Amino acid sequence: MSYLDRNFVLDLDTKDPLAKFKSEFVVDDPQLCYLDGNSLGRLPKRTITAVTDFLTKEWGPELVSGWSHWVDEAQPTGDLLGKSALGAAAGQILVCDTTSVNFYQLCVAAIKARPNRKTVITDSANFPTDRYILEGIARQFGLNLIMIQNEDPNVATNERITTEVLAPYLNDDVALVTFQIIQYRSGARSEVKAITDQVRAIGGLVLWDASHAIGAIELDLDNSGVDLCVGCTYKYGNSGPGSPAWLYVSKRIQNELQVPIQGWFAQEAQFEMGPKFEKAQSIRGFQIASPSLIGIRCVQSAFNMINEAGITQIAKKSAQGTELMIELYDHWLKPLGFDLNTPRNSDHRGGHISLVHPDAAQICVALRTLSKVIPDYRTPNSIRVAISPLATSYVEVWDGFARIRELVASGEYKKVKESGSRVT
């Protein structure tokens, strides 16, 4: 038996230690194959309860008195992420703001901590918001931004960042190096510990973006020697659209760094309302303003579920689920003109794979409108499909790929117009 046999895949679900969690998510249409948890996770039922309880049992009756226990919620919620998904000890993570804001804050703090260095390194396959922010920072501070050219969606492993890729660009002028842990398009996984060690050896700092990694693979920020990290919570974290992001600052360097936006939540004696800013000597020194409490309740309920499931089991299912996808691609989709833009080694990828096809945009729209399959499209020619380990069954993946094969083999997708939506 093999992955090509649906009964074999059903048996995988029967033996799956995470299968029980699927019933904890809202599934409006049981016939839908939702393979886009890498973009937005499903809604956990317990989140509905958590938000309702906050509105009716806290905000409603407590009013402003609630701030006595709400005020510091960004920190223990950050500790929950560290324990459940990031391999980080307490006191190093805040759940706050957006990934873009946190990225800007930590980038500027890092370059200010290396004032005699003028070079920042990233890669052209990095997520656009990170690249755009770096361009602005480089202009603002007169820095040399080096962009490693690795964005070729037709080369399967070209986007993966390794020490060998980075080495030619390193010298004693490098202040900051920043990459994705999992590349947003291809799903390629960077060498986190090795690259961090490599950059620290020349005196630079490394900022990782874990947005496409958290909740899909096992991370160990502390033992990997990571300096700085940011990420979102709404993908494999299942915390909802627009949910608060997070930032990680190693205790080693917290007192060394100063963020550019000095909000009052970072003030040492916050409620003395003093005339000058004095940074709190803890992770709170990186918090700008009030925690987003409704969003934080969503994060808490979702990451408590991840903690219950165990990130090791989650990572195993990600690896097996993407292995299933790749085998189905080899037998069903490659003969139909698809290419694979994701590393085959499970240690070199995350929870999604990228299927390249010249008609990718049209196929993606047709899958949603004709086949009840939801993946997503990324320019110029990629369809991303993912297994979200707590919410997705193996057979949902199998059925989704069977529908992709049927749609493309029949040519029916050619009758569908490409979407006019700004969102793909």
Task: Describe each PLM feature range.
Residues 1-424:
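Pyridoxal 5′-phosphate
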